[in-house]
Amino acid sequence: MLIDSYDRVVDYLRISVTERCNFRCQYCMPEKPFSWVPKENLLTFEELFLFVKVAIDEGIRKIRITGGEPLLREDLDKFIKMIFDYAPDIDLAMTTNAYLLKSTAQKLRDAGLKRLNVSIDTLKPEVAFAIAGKDVLKNVLDGVNEALAVGLKVKVNMVPMKNMNAQEIVDVLEYSKKRGMTIRFIEYMENKFASKEISGLKSDELLSMLREHYEFVDEGYDGASPSRYYKMSDGYRFGIIEPYGDDFCKQCNRIRLTAEGQLIPCLYFDEALSIAKSIKEGDIVAASEVLRDVVKNKPEKNRWGGEDGEVSTRAFYETGG
């Protein structure tokens, strides 16, 4: 079992298989980076899987595949099958923008993927274009429909932004609700790579807008989930992810691995340790030691909240949020 210095059990590994993305979302990466990491610098799926086995043996029980956009990496379904075959009881999920999902959903399901988180920030094509930098909405919605059709469980993520999509929170909630998908509204996480024009809705503003349409009660946090959940009078639940809240980090159970082999204890901070050398050399003992060191050095909380809140210098497209 992996336990950090604040007595939090760390059992969730997020793996970014690529930093590349086919969107240029305003809140993440509106401009193309000066250069992508050369593909030869990325760990192969076999190397990533070697570390996955180490992590599972040390106590990891949930794995999420992220990017960038993970579906841009060729043969992703084969990597998922490696994990599933080794540990079929692992909670195996993926976060995607769904642009390429229609043609890949069945393969992912057959490989052992169980759940998806999909970003749907709007239901208006012109707003989707403004957010993502290209015409994406039809592909995204077609991908979601296909994922549901093949039996994948889907959650929706939405980042409400003033003067852009905030007026659509009810529409996207209803879209999700009618299809049996939980929606989580995510407060915009300030970072130096995002557009300077963005102003995100805070949770109190969001709740005030939703109360004009619904009655609901606060159910609090669901285990180690980053979402605070609310239950509507008809039983439907929606979540709000509040990185600025005092309780956001209290039960954090996750670490992140980049495609280059950097193991990151916290989304907010730049600090990381590399497992690349030990994995390439097949040194399982050394890789386990790095894993335990990263868990031991997880910070208590991020620095978004409070009067002295800071802007993160982390490139979220490298770590998958």
Swiss-Prot record:
S-adenosyl-L-methionine binds at Y27, G68, S119, M189. GO terms for molecular function: 4 iron, 4 sulfur cluster binding; cyclic pyranopterin monophosphate synthase activity; GTP 3',8'-cyclase activity; GTP binding; metal ion binding; S-adenosyl-L-methionine binding. It catalyses: GTP + AH2 + S-adenosyl-L-methionine = (8S)-3',8-cyclo-7,8-dihydroguanosine 5'-triphosphate + 5'-deoxyadenosine + L-methionine + A + H(+). Pathway: Cofactor biosynthesis; molybdopterin biosynthesis. Its cofactor is [4Fe-4S] cluster. GTP binds at R14, R64, T95, K155, R254, I255, R256. Pfam families: Fer4_12, Mob_synth_C, Radical_SAM. InterPro entries: Aldolase_TIM (IPR013785), Elp3/MiaA/NifB-like_rSAM (IPR006638), MoaA (IPR013483), MoaA_NifB_PqqE_Fe-S-bd_CS (IPR000385), MoaA_twitch (IPR010505), MoCo_biosynth_MoaA/MoaC (IPR050105), rSAM (IPR007197). [4Fe-4S] cluster 1 binds at C21, C25, C28. Keywords: 4Fe-4S, GTP-binding, Iron, Iron-sulfur, Lyase, Metal-binding, Molybdenum cofactor biosynthesis, Nucleotide-binding, S-adenosyl-L-methionine. Residues 5-227 form the Radical SAM core domain. Belongs to the radical SAM superfamily. MoaA family. Catalyzes the cyclization of GTP to (8S)-3',8-cyclo-7,8-dihydroguanosine 5'-triphosphate. This is GTP 3',8-cyclase. It comes from Sulfurimonas denitrificans (strain ATCC 33889 / DSM 1251) (Thiomicrospira denitrificans (strain ATCC 33889 / DSM 1251)). The gene is moaA.
